[in-house]
Regions:
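Non-catalytic macromolecular-recognition regions in eukaryotic signaling proteins
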Residues: 1-162
Length: 162
């Protein structure tokens, strides 16, 4: 987990004073390691909790690829939306071998509660996942040996398990 931005006031039209934007990465052993999915179920849950709420902006989405850097000069707070991903913080670049991230929900939806600012919980019998297909460039660790899994903005304390 890495503190990406610490906010001390208004960003755009939103007061983010006291909020911190974190980015969570999978740390890999090798540059060519591949992260295909983050999944959870009732035996091995995946969760990212906050003691308050996660900042969600209407111009964002549940996936990092929903972020559009072209709007950030006009709506700067949208850059700090909370989302999940496999290696993307904006739309996939197909010419570079990147592929969009897909989501599956189980019996208990996790996307809608998370998009409403709640904690992310994947812990039911069917499980849930966000994933990319094998070979997508955005799942490859690269020189820094890490793959971005999500961005989370909160003014609370976070804990989690992936």
């Amino acid at each position: 987990i890495e503190a990406y931005a610490e906010h001390d006031g208004v960003v755009g039209t939103t007061d983010l004073a006291g909020y911190t934007t974190y980015r969570i990465y999978a740390l890999c052993d090798n540059e060519d390691d591949f992260v295909s999915a983050v999944a959870g179920d009732d035996e091995f849950s995946t969760f990212i909790h906050t003691t308050t709420t996660f900042f969600q902006h209407e111009a964002g989405g549940v996936l990092g690829e929903s972020s559009n850097p072209l709007i950030f000069p006009f709506i700067p707070e949208a850059a700090y939306d909370s989302w999940v991903t496999i290696g993307l913080d904006e739309a996939a670049d197909g010419t570079s071998g990147e592929s969009g991230v897909s989501i599956l929900e189980g019996l208990e939806p996790w996307v809608e509660p998370f998009e409403a600012g709640g904690s992310l919980n994947i812990a039911d019998a069917l499980g849930g996942v966000w994933y990319v297909l094998n070979g997508a460039a955005n799942g490859v660790a690269g020189e820094d040996k890490r793959v971005l899994l999500g961005q989370f903005t909160t003014d609370g304390n976070m804990d989690g398990q992936l």
